[in-house]
């Protein structure tokens, strides 16, 4: 009889111990985590597309002095990238005197950026394109592009501008009537000084 009572007491105590363990486990269960995501609306700035975007040009090798070839390549790469600041740095490497407009503007990079943004003219596309065309020598002996920029441009020189997509035949005819090429042109001296990139007169 005593053995039976002892067994009942042991089972009762064991049952109490298991309830406490369950309560302890329940009390230590971490609370559920709630994540709240906030969405911030940012107004996007209008994107200005460079006129060379999508333009596939290869700069052909030309028989030029090393200094001229180097500057030509650097100018071409910067023009394709619409890197106005680098272009201005190249323009001023050998001092002031670089011509980029016949107006009153004083900052070349700002001027080119404004023209690109307005979209009425495409100076970077023009610069990259004319540097892929044959060159000529201007009155000061500098290496100049395109060949239409000469005293007596040939029909082939005029046609090259149309084929390159820089000007329409009507625009070329107007320049011929005016007596000279007044489009975008550029020149580099024999010692590698980038002299100008300009249009008009």
Task: List where the protein language model places each region.
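Short helix-adjacent coil turns
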Residues: 75-87
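Bacterial N-terminal signal peptides that target proteins for export
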Residues: 1-4
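C-terminal-biased regions
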Residues: 17-29, 46-73, 88-201
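Serine/threonine-rich low-complexity intrinsically disordered regions
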Residues: 30-44
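C-terminal motif of bacterial Sec signal peptides marking the signal peptidase cleavage site
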Residues: 12-15
């Amino acid at each position: 009889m005593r053995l039976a009572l002892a067994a009942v007491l042991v089972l009762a105590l064991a049952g109490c111990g298991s309830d406490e363990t369950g309560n302890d486990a329940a009390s230590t269960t971490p609370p559920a985590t709630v994540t709240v995501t906030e969405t911030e609306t940012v107004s996007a700035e209008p994107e200005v597309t460079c006129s060379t975007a999508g333009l596939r040009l290869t700069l052909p090798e030309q028989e030029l002095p090393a200094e001229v070839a180097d500057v030509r390549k650097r100018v071409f790469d910067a023009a394709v990238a619409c890197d106005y600041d680098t272009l201005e740095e190249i323009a001023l490497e050998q001092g002031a005197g670089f011509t980029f407009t016949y107006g009153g503007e004083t900052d070349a990079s700002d001027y080119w950026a404004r023209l690109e943004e307005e979209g009425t003219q495409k100076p970077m596309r023009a610069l990259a394109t004319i540097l892929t065309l044959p060159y000529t020598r201007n009155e000061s002996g500098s290496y100049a592009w395109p060949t239409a920029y000469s005293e007596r441009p040939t029909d082939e020189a005029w046609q090259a501008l149309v084929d390159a997509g820089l000007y329409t035949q009507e625009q070329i005819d107007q320049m011929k009537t005016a007596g000279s090429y007044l489009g975008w042109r550029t020149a580099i001296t024999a010692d590698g000084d980038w002299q100008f990139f300009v249009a008009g007169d």
